Amino acid sequence: MTDAAHLRRRTEELLAAHPPATTDRLDFLRARFDAGLAWVHFPQGLGGLGVPRSLQAVVDAELAAAGAPDNDPRRIGIGLGMAAPTILQYGTEEQKSRLLRPLWTGEEVWCQLFSEPGAGSDLAALGTRAVRDGEDWVVNGQKVWTSSAHLARWAILIARTDPDLPKHKGITYFLCDMTDPGVEVRPLRQITGEAEFNEVFLTDVRIPDAMRLGEVGDGWRVAQTTLNNERVAIGGTAVPREGGMIGKIAATWRERPDLRTHDLHQRLLGLWVEAEVARLTGVRLRQQLVAGQPGPEGAGMKLNFARLNQEISGLEVELLGEEGLLYDDWTMRRPELVNFTGRDAGYRYLRSKGNSIEGGTSEVLLNIVAERVLGLPAEPRTDKDVAWKDLAR
């Protein structure tokens, strides 16, 4: 029996044992994970069957046709796209067994404690400290622009464990329980009125050494797995043709012939072609994951995602004229989903402004593409081989 046929049979068995029409959503997701049909390329016992990642489409198609419930990447995207692949590569067997199932089902939401007020684009300059105390690490510092921290049970965290080493070398990667004493989450309100992001203060937070990911001092290398997956997750998300931002403006174009002009038509066609190229590039980028780690090419995909979202949402506002500017819902909200295309045109236009900042600023990503994809010389650095504690701040 081929792998595809085997997966179809297992999917049929899952549906027979847990009919979607009569099974609780969460119970179904747990059963799907236990059947190895959550992410089929993961090992057996961890939600997968150890088969090629490309075969996930077989399972997804069968379950969609049966009307089966699924998890929501808009709510748990950080866990699915960033934490899970990092835990799979660097985690202990105990960490994988404890964390991956509730991560995938959405029972436990994850957030990312990386950026700091003084270390965003230059992330390796981070100053949050982790000091060893017996079997624990005591963490103190501040993180910022943390999506979903107000919902999260767990966080992926990088902190400085050796200030005497150069900035990239004295960092260690941890898994932080967001319910621990000393963790304080405060909302950061955006120009849309909502507070999707947060700042997180860590005061004498004790993290067991058993929740360290990778070796002490090797956190920067571990974090590259997270960051590369983040850029693929943001820029290379699977989108159907005429989905996403381009789908919104295309729908408006069809519904409102009174707004059409030849100039707007030509510009919309150009953006539609670019969106289709980006969609197909995303397909190719995701195929790279089948063979293993995503590379720095994800930076280019994320760059294009930000530019396209901003241009398309800008054209939509221009198309609608005064109607496109009628965004007046500044109610303080704490959303449970990250939704770039939700609500109306005014919201999409305002929200898209953050796309060129989150997940790495466009300027930083241009450097990554230049140095790691094109092989151009790196920019001159004055902090190379200088201890972090001696850097000007």
Residue ranges with predicted function:
Residues 128-131:
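A structural signal for short hydrophobic beta-strand segments in well-ordered beta-sheet cores
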Residues 33, 313-349, 359-368, 379-385:
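A glycine-biased, small/acidic residue-tolerant capping/turn segment at secondary-structure junctions
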Residues 183-280, 355, 389-391:
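Glycine-rich beta->alpha junctions and the first turn(s) of the following alpha-helix
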Residues 1-77, 88, 98, 102, ...:
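Amphipathic, small/basic residue-rich leader segments at the start of a protein or domain
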Residues 23, 262-265, 276-337:
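C-terminal helix-coil-helix/basic helical segment that borders enzyme active sites and/or dimer interfaces
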Residues 106-114, 158:
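A short, Trp-centered hydrophobic/proline-enriched beta-strand micro-motif
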